[in-house]
Curated annotation (Swiss-Prot):
Biological classification of the source: Bacteria, Fusobacteriati, Fusobacteriota, Fusobacteriia, Fusobacteriales
GO cellular component terms, A-Z: cytoplasm
Taxonomic source organism: Fusobacterium nucleatum subsp. nucleatum (strain ATCC 25586 / DSM 15643 / BCRC 10681 / CIP 101130 / JCM 8532 / KCTC 2640 / LMG 13131 / VPI 4355)
Pfam families: Queuosine_synth (PF02547)
Family: Belongs to the QueA family.
Enzyme class: transferase
Subunit structure: Monomer.
Metabolic or biological pathway, per its Swiss-Prot or TrEMBL entry: tRNA modification; tRNA-queuosine biosynthesis
The protein, known as: S-adenosylmethionine:tRNA ribosyltransferase-isomerase
Subcellular location: Cytoplasm
Annotated function: Transfers and isomerizes the ribose moiety from AdoMet to the 7-aminomethyl group of 7-deazaguanine (preQ1-tRNA) to give epoxyqueuosine (oQ-tRNA).
MF annotations from Gene Ontology: S-adenosylmethionine:tRNA ribosyltransferase-isomerase activity
SS bonds (residue pairs): none
Length: 351
C-alpha cells in the first residue's frame, strides 16, 4: 500500500492515488441491485461499518431529503461503415442541434470531411462528417426516417466505461430505475443500487425524494494529468433544478433537516446553484465546478457514492466531503475487504 503524505489539503495529484487490484473492478452489476456492499462512514466519530445497500434505510431519518439525478443514459455507442467497407465506432457525446451531434470516432482519421457512414443493416442511419474540432472530436449530421431515439435504441449499445470489458446483457442495468429523461452518455452510478421496493420503503419512512437532472458526459472519465490538480481543466455538464425542488431543499435546510445527495453528479449540480445567502437557486445551466479538499459544502449534508478511480476528480470531491487522508485509508480498507470499485462497484454512505 502506498504511504499517505501528511497533507490534508494537497493539490498534488500523487496524493489522490491508491493501489487497486484489477480483479476488484466491478465487471457486472450486483444482483439484485440493492445487494451491493455498503460502507457506512460517520464523519462525526470516524466510525466505519460494513452492510449491504438495502440496509441504508436504517441510516435515513424522517424529514431527510434524498436528491437523485434522474437523467437517462442513451445507447450512445454505434458502428458505421464507409462505402469502402471500413468500420468505425461512433460515440455520441453531445447533441448540438436536432440532427447534429458532437461525437468521438475510432479510428478518427479514417473519415474525411463530407464523407458518410452507414449505420444498421438497412442503413437506418446515415452520418455525414461536418467538422473536425480542435480537441479531435467530430461533428456529425444524421439522416434518418422516423424517430432518432427509436433507431438509436435499436442499433446502439450502452457507452460503458473503458475499464468494463464484459458485455452488458441487459441495457437497463446501466440505467437507474428512476431515470426519466435526458441524453447522458454515462450513468449516475450511485443510483444504480436503488430498487423500486427500497425507494418505496424509504418514502414510507418519511424521507422526501426529489429529482434534479445533470447530463453526465464523457468528461467524468477523463483522467487528471497535471501534477498540480488546480491546473486541470474541468469538463462542463448541463443541469436543471426546478423551482419546486429548490423550495423543498431550502425549506429543509432552514429547518436543519439533512440533504442527502445520491452521487457526485447530483452533488455537483446542487453545489453549482447556490446564491450568496446559501440558498439553492432553481435554474438550467452548465457547470464546470471542480470540488477538491478545502471546498466548503453549502447544500449537501450526506453523500451516497461509489468507489472512484485513482487520481480522479471524483475522488477529490469525496476527499473534500470527508478528509483526504481518512478517505484514502477507507479506500485501502475497501480493497482489503474486497469491495468492488467503479461504475458496477459497491457503495458508501458518508454522513
Amino acid at each position: 500500500m502506498k504511504k499517505l503524505r501528511k497533507r490534508k489539503m494537497s493539490t498534488y495529484l500523487s496524493d489522490y492515488d491508491y493501489f487497486l487490484p484489477e480483479e476488484l473492478i466491478g465487471q457486472k452489476p450486483r444482483e439484485p441491485r440493492d445487494s451491493a456492499k455498503l460502507m457506512l462512514i460517520d464523519r462525526k466519530n470516524g466510525s466505519v461499518e460494513h452492510k449491504n445497500f438495502y440496509n441504508i434505510i436504517d441510516y435515513l431519518q424522517k424529514g431527510d431529503i434524498l436528491v437523485r439525478n434522474a437523467t437517462k443514459v442513451i445507447p450512445a455507442r454505434i458502428f458505421g461503415h464507409k462505402d469502402t467497407g471500413g468500420v468505425l465506432e461512433i460515440l455520441l457525446i453531445k447533441r448540438i442541434t436536432l440532427d447534429t451531434w458532437e461525437c468521438l470516432l475510432k479510428p478518427a482519421k479514417k473519415l474525411k470531411l463530407g464523407q458518410k457512414l452507414y449505420i444498421g443493416e438497412n442503413k437506418e442511419l446515415i452520418a455525414e462528417l461536418l467538422e473536425i474540432k480542435e480537441d479531435g472530436n467530430r461533428i456529425l449530421k444524421f439522416y434518418y426516417e422516423g424517430s432518432f431515439e427509436e433507431i438509436l435504441d435499436k442499433l446502439g449499445s450502452m457507452p460503458l466505461p473503458p475499464y468494463i470489458t464484459r458485455k452488458l446483457e441487459n441495457k437497463d442495468r446501466y440505467q437507474t430505475v428512476y431515470a426519466q429523461r435526458g441524453e447522458s452518455v454515462a450513468a449516475p452510478t450511485a443510483g444504480l443500487h436503488f430498487t423500486e421496493e427500497l425507494l418505496n420503503k424509504i418514502l414510507d419512512k418519511g424521507v422526501e425524494i426529489v429529482d434534479i437532472f445533470l447530463e453526465v458526459g464523457l468528461g467524468t472519465f477523463r483522467p487528471v494529468q497535471t501534477v498540480n490538480v488546480l491546473e486541470h481543466k474541468m469538463h462542463e455538464e448541463s443541469f436543471e433544478i426546478s423551482e419546486k425542488v429548490a423550495k423543498i431543499i431550502n425549506e429543509a435546510k432552514a429547518e436543519g433537516r439533512r440533504i442527502i445527495s445520491v452521487g457526485t453528479t447530483a452533488t455537483r449540480a446542487l453545489e453549482s446553484s447556490v446564491d450568496e445567502n446559501g440558498k439553492l437557486i432553481a435554474q438550467k445551466k452548465d457547470t464546470g465546478i471542480f470540488i477538491y479538499p478545502g471546498y466548503k459544502f453549502k447544500i449537501v449534508d450526506a453523500l451516497i457514492t461509489n468507489f472512484h478511480l485513482p487520481k480522479s476528480t471524483l475522488l477529490m470531491l469525496v476527499s473534500a466531503f470527508y478528509d483526504r487522508e481518512k478517505m484514502l485509508e477507507i479506500y485501502n480498507l475497501a480493497v482489503k475487504e474486497k469491495y468492488h470499485f467503479f461504475s458496477f462497484g459497491d457503495s458508501m454512505f458518508i454522513y
